[in-house]
């Protein structure tokens, strides 16, 4: 932790094609080894595939998918009297989008399609239709929070 106050948040520049900060954040999540050009190519070709397969605007479908993935509750471990409790807590808005994007990219990478463009496009379409690995992860997170509702009074 810094000694002299908190570190200011760096602002993300919107991407050149869709003019969306959310798209830039997704590009940053896809990017490996600083290869932004490759990440942009993957995302924009995935968006083209989404438009072809759904017949709707890719940005619309993507935003719908992210809204279906973002968690509202999660559990945090809290040590009380020698035992650990999984305490349900609300997720801050910024963390919601971060988790949503992280889960989308991770579950896209785990899919079986041949190219990353295909995997990402299919994961976005699945998430928009409330199916797929990322949405299942959100459901599991919510189930954990629901199951541990009894420990909600340990919140800090």
Swiss-Prot record:
An annotated Gene Ontology molecular function:
rRNA binding
Q: Which gene encodes it?
A: rpsG
Q: Which InterPro entries does the record cross-reference, listed alphabetically?
A: Ribosomal_uS7 (IPR000235), Ribosomal_uS7_bac/org-type (IPR005717), Ribosomal_uS7_CS (IPR020606), Ribosomal_uS7_dom (IPR023798), Ribosomal_uS7_dom_sf (IPR036823)
Q: Which residues form the signal peptide?
A: none
* Family classification: Belongs to the universal ribosomal protein uS7 family.
Q: Which UniProt keywords apply?
A: Ribonucleoprotein, Ribosomal protein, RNA-binding, rRNA-binding, tRNA-binding
Cited function: One of the primary rRNA binding proteins, it binds directly to 16S rRNA where it nucleates assembly of the head domain of the 30S subunit. Is located at the subunit interface close to the decoding center, probably blocks exit of the E-site tRNA.
Give the quaternary structure. Part of the 30S ribosomal subunit. Contacts proteins S9 and S11.
Any GO CC annotation of this UniProt entry: small ribosomal subunit
Coiled-coil blocks: none
- Biological process according to GO: translation
User: Which PANTHER family is this protein grouped with?
Assistant: RIBOSOMAL PROTEIN S7
Q: What is the name of the protein in this document?
A: Small ribosomal subunit protein uS7
List residues traversing the bilayer: none
